[in-house]
């Protein structure tokens, strides 16, 4: 064992796998820390700051290890996934974790901490009074046209529960707050780039604590998390766009109101100072990890006193709130009896910046400014149907998608929380449409694209020439090990241009797109014009020990060809806009080659099955996976496959893979199928990751492909079920990364992976606008396209759809029998065309074109195809619908409990199979 140890940390589920719990040396070779744990199962590892192979420890290379109180457990070096140390306290309390190094061996032991001792104070306890505060409460905004008023909308989407549930908010800077209701132990932490300073908080009414464990209920609101008591309530709000949190308490009657925040600030290692309206805690730079704020300014919206206290004065801070004896214990009291008391905590890297944030918070009534900006966000892309449950789920999916937008390393979208708190190229651009574009956040979308484009590999001698990073973990650490991240970005460039009409950006981004195409032609193009790649370089990228792929999909996967095809389509449009005739002509020829050869190589005419990939030796792999659906949904212009083949693709995939709770990553009839993802003794979790496990984001293109071919009612059943996941399971208000394929209880699904995943919620939100409403703006051609695929249960709705420079299309709909009534009103000043495609029940569809000016109405008989409208310059065209009877009749499949997957009967079956084959190493 190396004698010079780095600082080691306990990283686990209780601290977001962060640097909250460093181990301190207490004796030679012995290191310990004290943590507060609730009576749940907690998973963790012992690791250095970067989780290096040499300094990452658990109890077993593959399996989980259950720790027993007061018993030493041997440690081994391992970086695996799913092989954590597990500990489940019988009751909430503080626990000492001791790691001991002896020679070449290491052990860990957990014991109940005997005392929560406060150290001898090395400075005086502060008492500071703020006698006057200039505070003007902000008034609610006027209702937005076509939308519910703010209080009505917030009340409709509020989620109330009387039992504990987890939740998460993001600050859109570099931090997020994960919490749990009805508890004080591990009840929440506001995590910055590294570490945390603010945990949970307690509110007091006339000196009596509001006990969260006994709250009547907890309410997840669009703007915060509220606990309700008999005659009062308290609320946590994380402010969007800055490092600020607001802790609030409300009382039905004027009372003395107080707040105590849980602060992870050691009393003896902090300096304290005052300013006009509050106090500032300052930490030594040596104690602040890179990117973490060093100063915390605290203020309130009413006259108040700030008192640093001890456990002897307030024992409930130890017994009920579970504060650490080492840390500051700050009471903030209102000077007068009040019905509302807001406390702001503002985090910054300089004291002056922290104070400035605090003063601004009071002057602007920041908590309500934040609240009403959320209202305007929700109204910017608005859909309100007669299905209230679906409305709520869509609103929460949109809100949840904002959790991941950040500016940690420039504008980006984190992939997932807690352990994918990085900007992944693939994930970012799959999520961009449902996070930014549908919500009218066009400048944000442009900033994210520009940021990734600036990191494009421009070294012509590199194998990654033309690629943007797959993963950005810092401004100097970028990984380019993906073949699809850049094509997804180029696809979103085209979506951005069509939503915004930004022709200037079409010129700016063209060299980036051209460089990518050149890079593919130089290194990755086969004789058929198809794009080649390594086995693990698709989204199914899990590898054994970081070397051999669990789900090999080289060297030509079907989704990669669809993305390559879409990239060429986008490049051709950009070449035309930039008057690059030679490039346009060359790429058009290549595009046609891809289209014809893709069908001949991938489509089996005899079996009517699309290959998942073509191997390097030319063999087709006909594994039934959901990827085939992307060959239909990825292209934004002319389709890659004919409608006849497309309907077969949908039928094949959905009939084999779609359960009521999501679409499997591999058919249950496949030999490699794994029915469960995590916590299995028979196999490593990564063997199941893409071999059966359900991915939330795959539901997005499943809904799109079903709606494309007339399966919108089954798609909507899936959306409804996913909506229940968002509003009632796991971390409430968001979606997890994964689910087990086989589920025994629809009402209590087994989730896995990250507790919140960007593309899961963004795809759910995207489906509402782009698929059910069928809104596809085409501003490059001065046209708005609507091709609604409305579920039959929708009888009426209102919608606001953003496009251009702050413009909206307001839409209302009602249905009476076969008669559909549409009303359109656009806000743009310039003339624009409307293209409306309406599906008839007779197998045809009517395309309506006209000038979008003022308010226009359309009446449509879906049975007869009769249409009435007051559209100017009306043109109509009748076409054959691509709706498929076979798709419209599809139903969910179910787990086949009669089969016993090989993965369950033969331990490590897939790992042994792969290691016995001659797979090429793919080390990044």
What residues fall within each predicted segment?
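Aromatic-rich carbohydrate-recognition surfaces in CAZymes
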Residues: 421-533, 557-565, 621, 693-706, ...
């Amino acid at each position: 064992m190396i004698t010079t140890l780095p600082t080691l940390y306990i990283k686990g589920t209780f601290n977001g796998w962060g640097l909250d719990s460093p181990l301190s040396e207490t004796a030679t070779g012995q290191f310990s820390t004290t943590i507060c744990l609730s009576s749940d199962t907690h998973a963790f590892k012992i690791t250095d700051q970067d989780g290096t192979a040499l300094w990452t420890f658990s109890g077993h290379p593959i399996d989980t290890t259950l720790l027993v109180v007061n018993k030493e457990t041997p440690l081994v070096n391992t970086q695996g996934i799913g092989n954590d140390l597990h500990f489940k306290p019988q009751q909430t309390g503080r626990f000492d974790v001791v790691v001991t190094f002896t020679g070449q061996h290491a052990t860990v032991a957990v014991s109940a901490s005997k005392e929560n001792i406060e150290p001898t104070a090395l400075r005086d306890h502060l008492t500071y009074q703020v006698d006057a505060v200039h505070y003007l409460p902000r008034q609610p905004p006027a209702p937005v046209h076509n939308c519910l008023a703010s209080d009505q909308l917030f009340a409709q989407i509020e989620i109330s529960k009387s039992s504990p549930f987890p939740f998460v908010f993001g600050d859109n800077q570099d931090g997020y707050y994960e919490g749990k209701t009805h508890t004080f132990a591990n009840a929440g932490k506001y995590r910055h780039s590294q570490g945390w300073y603010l945990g949970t908080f307690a509110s007091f009414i006339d000196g009596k604590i509001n006990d969260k464990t006994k709250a009547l209920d907890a309410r997840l609101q669009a703007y915060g998390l509220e606990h309700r008591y008999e005659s009062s309530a308290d609320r946590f709000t994380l402010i969007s766009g800055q490092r600020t949190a607001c802790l609030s308490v409300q009382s039905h009657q004027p009372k003395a109101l107080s707040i105590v925040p849980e602060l992870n600030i050691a009393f003896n290692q902090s300096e304290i100072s005052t300013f006009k309206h509050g106090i500032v805690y300052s930490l030594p730079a040596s104690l602040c990890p890179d990117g973490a704020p060093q100063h915390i300014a605290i203020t309130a919206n009413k006259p108040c006193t700030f008192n640093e206290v001890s456990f002897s004065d307030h024992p409930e801070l130890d017994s009920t709130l579970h504060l650490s004896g080492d840390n500051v214990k700050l009471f903030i009291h209102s000077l007068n009896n009040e019905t509302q008391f807001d406390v702001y905590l503002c985090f910054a890297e300089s004291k002056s910046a922290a104070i400035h944030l605090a003063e601004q918070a009071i002057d602007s009534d920041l908590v309500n400014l934040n609240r009403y900006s959320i209202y305007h966000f929700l109204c910017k892309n608005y859909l309100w149907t007669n299905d209230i449950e679906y409305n709520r789920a869509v609103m929460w999916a949109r809100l949840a998608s904002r959790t991941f937008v950040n500016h940690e390393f420039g504008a980006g979208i984190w992939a997932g929380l807690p352990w994918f708190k990085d900007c992944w190229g693939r994930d970012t651009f799959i999520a961009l449409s449902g996070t930014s574009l549908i919500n009218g956040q066009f400048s944000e979308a442009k900033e994210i694209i520009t940021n990734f484009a600036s990191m494009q590999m421009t070294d012509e001698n590199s194998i990654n020439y033309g690629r943007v990073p797959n993963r950005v973990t810092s401004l100097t650490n970028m990984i380019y090990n993906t073949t699809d991240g850049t094509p997804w970005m180029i696809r979103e460039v085209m979506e951005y241009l069509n939503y915004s009409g930004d022709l200037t950006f079409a010129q700016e981004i063209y060299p980036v797109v051209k460089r990518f195409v050149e890079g593919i032609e130089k290194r990755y193009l086969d004789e058929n014009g198809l794009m080649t790649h390594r086995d693990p370089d698709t989204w199914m990228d899990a590898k054994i020990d970081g070397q051999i792929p669990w789900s090999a999909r080289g060297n030509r996967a079907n989704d990669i060809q669809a993305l390559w095809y879409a990239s060429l389509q986008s490049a051709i449009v950009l070449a035309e806009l930039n008057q690059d005739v030679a490039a346009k002509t060359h790429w058009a020829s290549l595009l046609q080659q891809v289209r014809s050869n893709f069908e001949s190589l991938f489509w089996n005419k005899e079996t009517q099955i699309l290959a998942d990939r073509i191997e390097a030796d030319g063999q087709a792999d006909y594994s039934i996976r959901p990827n085939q659906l992307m060959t239909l949904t990825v292209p934004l212009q002319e389709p890659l496959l004919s409608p006849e083949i497309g309907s077969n693709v949908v039928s094949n995939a959905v009939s084999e893979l779609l359960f009521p709770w999501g679409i499997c990553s591999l058919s249950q009839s496949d030999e490699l199928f794994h029915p469960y993802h995590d916590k299995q003794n028979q196999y490593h979790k990564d063997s199941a990751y893409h071999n059966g496990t359900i991915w939330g984001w795959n539901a997005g293109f499943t809904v799109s492909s079903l709606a494309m071919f007339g399966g919108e009612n089954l798609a909507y059943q899936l959306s409804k079920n996913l909506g229940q996941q968002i509003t009632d399971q796991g971390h409430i208000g968001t979606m997890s990364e994964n689910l087990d394929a086989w589920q025994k209880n629809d009402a209590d699904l087994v989730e896995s992976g990250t507790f919140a995943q960007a593309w899961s919620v963004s795809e759910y939100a995207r489906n509402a606008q782009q698929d059910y409403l069928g809104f596809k703006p085409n501003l490059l051609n001065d046209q708005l396209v609507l091709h609604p695929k409305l579920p039959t249960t929708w009888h009426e709705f209102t919608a606001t759809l953003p496009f251009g420079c702050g413009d909206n299309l307001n839409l209302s709909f009602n249905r009476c029998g076969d008669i559909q009534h549409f009303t359109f009103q656009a806000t743009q000043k310039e003339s624009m065309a409307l293209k409306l495609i309406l599906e008839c029940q007779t197998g045809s569809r009517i395309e309506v074109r006209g000038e979008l000016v003022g308010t226009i109405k359309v009446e449509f008989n879906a049975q007869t195809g009769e249409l009435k409208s007051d559209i100017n310059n009306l043109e109509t065209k009748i076409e054959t619908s691509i709706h498929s009877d076979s798709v419209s009749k599809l139903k969910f499949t179910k787990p086949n409990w009669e089969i016993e997957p090989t993965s369950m009967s033969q331990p490590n079956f897939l790992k042994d199979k792969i290691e016995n084959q001659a797979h090429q190493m793919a080390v990044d």
